[in-house]
A protein has these predicted regions:
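Bacterial N-terminal signal peptides that target proteins for export
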Residues: 2-15
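A beta-rich soluble binding module of mature secreted/lumenal proteins
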Residues: 2-5, 22-188
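Bacterial N-terminal signal peptides
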Residues: 13-24
Length: 188
C-alpha cells in the first residue's frame, strides 16, 4: 500500500514535517548556492521520467527511507509534477509525496523551485548532468546541505560515481556525509 501525502488526518503529521523541512530550506530560497552553477543547456522534456536516488545528504523528510525514486512529468501549464516515493521499513509501507516544480528564469538552465506544500518553495538545481543521455544527475538545493545523486538505473557506474563525488567535493559539499540509498526492492 502506498500512502500519498494529502490533507487527510493520518498523513497530517508527515505533511507538517514536510512543511517544516521546506521552511528550513534556507528560508525557502530558490537561488543557486554561491559558487555553484546549474547546468545549461537543459531540456526539461528529456529530464522527465523516473530517477532513482543513489545518494543523498540526510534530512528528516527522507530519513529511514530506502528505494527512493523521484518522477517528473511536465504539465500542460508548464509546471512539472513531482512524485517522490520511498520505502519505510519501520512501517513496512511505501511513502509518497506529491509536489510541483517550476523552472526559474531561463528555461534552458537547470534551476527549478519545488513545492510539496502550498506557496513554500525550495531550490532544486542540477549541478551535474549526463547531457548526452540524461542517465545521471547531481542536484543541490538552496545550500550545500542538500544534495542528491540520481540515476535512471538503480546502480551508478563506479567511474560516474567517482566523478560526481569529485565535483561535489570541489563545490564545497561534504561527501563524507552522503547516505548511499539501498535500492533492492522489486515491489515498488
Amino acid at each position: 500500500m502506498t500512502r500519498t501525502l494529502r490533507f487527510a488526518a493520518p498523513s497530517l503529521s508527515l505533511a507538517i514535517l514536510l512543511v517544516a523541512s521546506l521552511l528550513g530550506l534556507n528560508a525557502c530560497s530558490t537561488t543557486v548556492p554561491e559558487g555553484i552553477a546549474s547546468v545549461t543547456p537543459f531540456d526539461i522534456e528529456r529530464y522527465q521520467g523516473k530517477w532513482y536516488e543513489i545518494a543523498r545528504l540526510d534530512h528528516s523528510f527522507e530519513r529511514g527511507l530506502s528505494d527512493v525514486s523521484a518522477s517528473y512529468r511536465q504539465q500542460p501549464d508548464g509546471s512539472v509534477e513531482v512524485i517522490n516515493r520511498g520505502y519505510d521499513s519501520k512501517r513496512n509501507d511505501w511513502r509518497q509525496a506529491l509536489g510541483r516544480a517550476l523552472l526559474t528564469g531561463d528555461t534552458k538552465r537547470a534551476s527549478l523551485k519545488v513545492s510539496f506544500f502550498g506557496p513554500f518553495y525550495g531550490g532544486y538545481h542540477v549541478m551535474a548532468l549526463d547531457q548526452q543521455n540524461y542517465q545521471w544527475a547531481m542536484v543541490v538545493g538552496p545550500d550545500r546541505d542538500y544534495l542528491w545523486i540520481l540515476a535512471r538505473e538503480k546502480r551508478l557506474q563506479e567511474g560516474v560515481r567517482a566523478h560526481l563525488l569529485h565535483e561535489a567535493g570541489a563545490a564545497g559539499i561534504d561527501t563524507q556525509k552522503l547516505i548511499w540509498v539501498e535500492q533492492t526492492r522489486t515491489d515498488g
